[in-house]
A protein has these predicted regions:
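Structured, active/binding-site neighborhoods that engage oxygen-rich ligands
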Residues: 1-196
Length: 196
């Protein structure tokens, strides 16, 4: 197997595994985690009192992995852009997130969007321009889902890299904190893929 492809699989697999390991502990303090689970050493079911994923089965992934896979899918579809570089259309991403949220609600999931993403997408749903709604996003949403950007776009061309990261942040996390955190995660992934 091509080493870059193997590392890409590893990056996505690592994202999903880390997400599944952390799923039962979302939004819990260290004391709450110890009280509910003791010392976690593997995949466990979420407790019924878990605020975001009550009763979720061990090994289940959250919106972190699901949103990353949405970005990966959009990047694959955008590969034929005129620039020849991986491309993520921010407006299309906003509408894809809305459709994903609707499907999660229909399936009865409580593990939906974080506060910054939710607030921005409510404005999109109300008819606002998707490229103008992310100015208050200071949570971790952009960083948690950016792994596919790091896989698809090398840091070798910083301008193209920054543009790709920005396109994944703009709709929900168009802030310095949102962009910088996503850029750091994507850069670490990109350098790992490039074996830098």
């Amino acid at each position: 197997m091509d080493p870059r492809l193997s590392r890409a699989y590893g990056a996505l697999g690592g994202l999903a595994l880390g997400d599944a390991l952390g799923m039962p502990t979302q939004a819990l303090s260290p004391a709450q985690i110890r009280s509910m689970y003791g010392h976690i050493t593997g995949l466990v079911d979420a407790d019924e009192s878990q605020p975001y994923a009550p009763g979720m089965r061990a090994g289940s992934v959250t919106d972190d992995t699901e949103q990353a896979l949405l970005i990966a899918s959009l990047l694959v579809r955008g590969r034929g852009s005129s620039s020849g570089h991986a491309h993520l259309d921010a407006s299309e991403f906003a509408h894809t997130l809305l459709a994903w949220e609707d499907s999660m609600i229909q399936r009865g999931s409580l593990d939906l969007l974080g506060p910054s993403t939710k607030a921005a997408l409510e404005r999109v749903r109300a008819g606002e321009d998707p490229l103008q709604v992310g100015g208050k996003g200071t949570t971790n949403g952009a960083a948690m889902r950016v792994t596919p950007i790091g896989i698809a776009v090398s840091t070798a061309n910083p301008d193209i890299f920054a543009e790709a990261v920005w396109s994944s942040c703009q709709v929900t996390h168009a802030t310095r904190q949102g962009f910088q955190s996503a850029a750091l995660v994507a850069a670490a992934v990109s350098m790992g893929i490039d074996a830098a």
